[in-house]
């Protein structure tokens, strides 16, 4: 994950991350100080959620509600990437006083294998288009065996862990794996995993 703008990321296995990308306007930012500040914010959040006083996920351990994956301070840009145990954790962490990420207004986000999303009745006739915006028939979508489906409500830039195959007509394709989600209504993105 190397985003050029703030986004929410859904991996091929459905795991959730977010990236906070901010322009510094040429102001120098100390990477170590930023990392320390963000680690403290993550630890505080995790403690409030009843998890350990940790800032990073540990191997072979349960995922923390929030984890700081990486921090990078460049000449003009700072980037922080966070991992989450659930969408509820992503949303709650975004609402803390320690988090300056206002890049998304998501109120719901769920990811699951396409076969499960179809079985659960996520899609109705005419809701989906191919990545390029052309019409996608329901049969075409149902024949896609290896896809991952994302359903969301609220605005955001959504980056996914594979090539976008289908999307709601109310979304905008930004590149092969990035979609702009609308502020209102339910949006769907199906990507190859």
Predicted segment positions?
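Mature, soluble, non-transmembrane domains
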Residues: 61-193
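N-terminal Sec/ER secretory leader and immediately downstream segment
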Residues: 1-66
């Amino acid at each position: 994950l190397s985003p050029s703008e703030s986004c929410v990321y859904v991996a091929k296995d459905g795991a959730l991350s977010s990236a906070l990308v901010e322009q510094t306007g040429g102001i120098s930012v100390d990477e170590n100080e930023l990392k320390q500040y963000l680690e403290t914010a993550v630890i505080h959040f995790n403690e409030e959620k009843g998890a350990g006083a940790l800032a990073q996920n540990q191997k072979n351990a349960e995922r923390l509600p929030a984890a700081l994956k990486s921090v990078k301070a460049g000449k003009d840009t700072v980037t922080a990437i966070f991992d989450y145990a659930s969408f509820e954790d992503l949303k709650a962490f975004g609402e803390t006083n320690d988090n300056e990420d206002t890049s998304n207004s998501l109120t719901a986000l769920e990811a699951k294998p396409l076969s499960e999303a179809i079985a659960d009745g996520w899609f109705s006739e005419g809701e989906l288009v191919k990545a390029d915006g052309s019409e996608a028939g329901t049969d075409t979508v149902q024949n896609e065996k290896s896809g991952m489906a994302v359903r969301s409500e609220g605005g955001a830039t959504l980056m996914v862990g594979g090539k976008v195959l289908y999307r709601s007509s109310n979304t905008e394709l930004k590149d092969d794996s990035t979609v702009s989600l609308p502020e209102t209504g339910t949006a769907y993105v199906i990507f190859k995993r």
